[in-house]
């Protein structure tokens, strides 16, 4: 944990950055994240940069460049002698870092879609060749300083820095020099450049070169460009009106409804192309925010992106932690240190697990806003499910209940009634490891590995990542889960304490057994004909879900649970396979109370026992292959029972003769 982050920020500054009321929406969370992120950034960067300017920057947007040498190319401009000129050393190439990205003042539209460009002087060249990189370098002098929004800010530029840059950009000789210098530098790098293209400027009467983000007027211009983009986004020419800020509650202030870069990337502007007949210039009447609030919300996007875990099928589940109740400065430090751990590379599931076992006063107040998004083929993120409150105890309590189920007599090698052996399994859901179970609940794997998966691709199963850190965002190569996907829906319900649909779960369990068996029956390994571990996972999970009251009150009697603490009523001396089977049935009301269900259960057990015998005798056409789960119906069960009983008689007779 970054134990000292925000220690250098005063209580007064922290509390002025916080909302005066408890968090009540995703916007509130994003605003809080953005405000704290800006304060932490300002604290950590060794440069005198105003927090208002940092709030508009996006240093993490191209964070992959931090691991690369030669990832920042700057054209050196000297404005110190009254006449703007290029420096004798025209080009400077160095390694970009997070702090340097702040000093450069890099500002990019959050989760950019389409052909949008950066608001800052710095522009990203994505592995571009000599000519394209040189073009980007020229534009730092020809296009950026002459932008309309930048020129409006230039009117208050006492030092004339913006116009001096524009003057250089209008000089053909200067542009030719820049072009040749950049092309030569990129050629020396192997012909391509992957990094930011920017400027280094020695300001009027200055004695050293500075990055653009270290020069206030250039930051003002960058903010002006971003403000202009907010106000005229999409079809709107001017979306500003007078209203009450949706987040802060400030009344009668200039507000806008256009918020490109909103949290989760699914709360977006009113767009006339999506809602015919709407006036985009009146977008401020929907979730109105001031520009400052909108920028804080957008700044929170960096933190929000870090709080996602990959569910599968192009779906991400995002957990956004917050504290219940109104926060004070110490609460803010505690919360941001949690978030900073995620920003520093820990997974959100790891961090939430650590806080669960912390068992502190604040961890008891810890909640999370949860939502799931899917990336469709048009490369836009779609909201599938959301919930405003997850309490951290939910996955922790469920993990502990699951371990108790695995310690109970059906799995216990110390109990003569044991029916399930899991000693040979390294499956996380059968390993009694609380930490793995906790994370599997949050990642969705806990239910994804037991419930039927629609559109499942069996060819990917062997390489599927079951537990661990979230995988990278996936795009068009993955199938997309829709709102009818029960594993995803049930995961969001489970962590949000919304009741699980019990009947749908039971049907889905059965379909998953069939699904997994069909995969096994089609595999080259003929010794694996039945998804044993799927059934064991389902059994332990069912007990754990009931133990934590995860189901609703829908009528489904009798409740199919057992007394996990029931003491053994028989000893090793008296136990037989018959008495063990009888004990199992008698301890499960759902079997004991229903003759048809009991008969089907015993039939399945007999098919399994005969298959084990056939495997020992190396008989390839086994009973479980002949009578797979999905082949048995109410119409043919009587015939199949007779055939299985006949086979049992024949094998018993043959065994007696041998």
Where are these regions (language model features)?
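Extended alpha-helical scaffolding segments
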Residues: 1-192, 206-211, 217-219, 252-257, ...
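Short Cys/His-rich Zn2+-coordinating modules
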Residues: 213-235, 268-276
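Eukaryotic N-terminal, low-complexity and coiled-coil-prone scaffolding/targeting segments
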Residues: 242-243, 251-252, 260-280
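Class I S-adenosyl-L-methionine
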Residues: 203
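Short beta-strand-alpha-helix junction that forms the catalytic/metal-binding core
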Residues: 276-296
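Structural beta-strand/beta-sheet cores of well-ordered domains, especially the beta-sheet scaffolds
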Residues: 195-197, 241-243, 286, 316-318, ...
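Short cysteine-rich clusters marking metal-coordination/redox-active sites
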Residues: 245-249, 290
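Short, flexible, mixed-charge glycine/proline-rich loop motifs
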Residues: 229-242, 279-283
């Amino acid at each position: 944990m970054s134990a000292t982050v925000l220690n250098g920020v005063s209580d007064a500054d922290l509390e002025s950055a916080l909302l005066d009321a408890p968090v009540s929406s995703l916007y509130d969370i994003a605003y809080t994240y953005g405000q704290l992120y800006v304060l932490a950034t300002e604290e950590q960067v060794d440069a005198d940069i105003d927090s208002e300017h940092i709030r508009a920057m996006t240093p993490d947007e191209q964070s992959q460049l931090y691991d690369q040498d030669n990832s920042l190319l700057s054209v050196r401009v000297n404005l110190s002698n009254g006449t703007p000129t290029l420096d004798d050393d025209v080009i400077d190439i160095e390694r970009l870092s997070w702090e340097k990205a702040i000093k450069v003042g890099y500002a990019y539209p959050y989760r950019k879609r389409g052909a949008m460009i950066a608001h800052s002087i710095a522009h990203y060249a994505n592995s571009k060749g000599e000519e394209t990189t040189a073009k980007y370098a020229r534009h730092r002098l020809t296009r950026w300083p002459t932008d309309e929004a930048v020129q409006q800010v230039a009117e208050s530029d006492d030092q004339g820095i913006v116009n001096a840059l524009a003057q250089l950009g209008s000089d053909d000789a200067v542009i030719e020099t820049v072009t040749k210098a950049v092309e030569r530098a990129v050629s020396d790098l192997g012909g391509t450049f992957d990094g930011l293209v920017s400027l280094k400027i020695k300001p009027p009467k200055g004695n050293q070169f500075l990055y653009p983000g270290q020069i206030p007027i250039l930051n003002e211009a960058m903010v002006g460009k971003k403000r202009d983009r907010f106000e005229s986004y999409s079809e709107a020419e001017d979306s500003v009106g007078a209203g009450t800020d949706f987040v802060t509650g400030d009344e009668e202030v200039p507000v806008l409804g256009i918020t490109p870069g909103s949290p989760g990337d699914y709360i977006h502007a009113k767009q006339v192309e999506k809602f015919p007949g709407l006036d985009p210039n009146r977008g401020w009447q929907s979730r109105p925010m001031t520009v400052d609030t909108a920028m804080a919300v957008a700044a929170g996007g960096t933190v929000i992106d870090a709080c996602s875990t990959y569910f599968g099928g192009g779906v991400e589940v995002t957990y956004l932690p917050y504290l219940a109740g109104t926060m004070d400065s110490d609460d803010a430090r505690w919360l941001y240190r949690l978030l900073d751990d995620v920003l520093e590379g820990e997974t959100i599931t790891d961090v939430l697990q650590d806080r669960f076992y912390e068992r502190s006063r604040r961890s008891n107040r810890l909640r999370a806003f949860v939502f799931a998004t899917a990336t469709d083929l048009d490369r836009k993120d779609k909201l599938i499910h959301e919930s405003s409150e997850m309490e951290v105890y939910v996955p922790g309590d469920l993990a502990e209940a699951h371990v108790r189920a695995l310690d109970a007599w059906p799995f216990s090698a110390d109990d003569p009634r044991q029916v399930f052996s899991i000693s040979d399994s390294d499956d996380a859901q059968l390993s009694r490891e609380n930490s793995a179970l906790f994370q599997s609940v949050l990642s969705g794997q806990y239910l994804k590995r037991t419930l039927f998966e629609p559109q499942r691709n069996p060819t990917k199963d062997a390489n599927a990542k079951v537990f661990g850190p979230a995988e990278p965002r996936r795009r068009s190569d993955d199938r997309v889960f829709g709102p009818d996907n029960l594993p995803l829906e049930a995961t969001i319900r489970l962590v949000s304490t919304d009741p699980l649909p019990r009947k749908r779960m039971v049907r889905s369990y059965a379909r998953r057994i069939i699904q997994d068996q069909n995969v096994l029956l089609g595999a080259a390994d003929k010794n694996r004909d039945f998804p044993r571990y799927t059934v064991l996972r389902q059994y332990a999970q069912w007990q754990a879900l009931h133990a934590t009251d995860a189901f609703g009150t829908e009528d489904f009697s009798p409740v199919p649970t057992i007394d996990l603490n029931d003491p053994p009523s028989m000893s090793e001396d008296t136990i037989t396979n018959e008495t063990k089977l009888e004990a199992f049935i008698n301890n499960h009301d759902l079997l004991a109370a229903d003759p048809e269900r009991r008969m089907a259960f015993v039939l399945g057990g007999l098919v399994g026992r005969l298959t084990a015998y056939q495997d020992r005798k190396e008989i390839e056409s086994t009973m479980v292959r002949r009578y797979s789960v999905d082949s048995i119906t109410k119409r043919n069960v009587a015939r199949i029972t007779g055939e299985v009983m006949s086979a049992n008689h024949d094998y018993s007779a043959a065994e007696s003769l041998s």
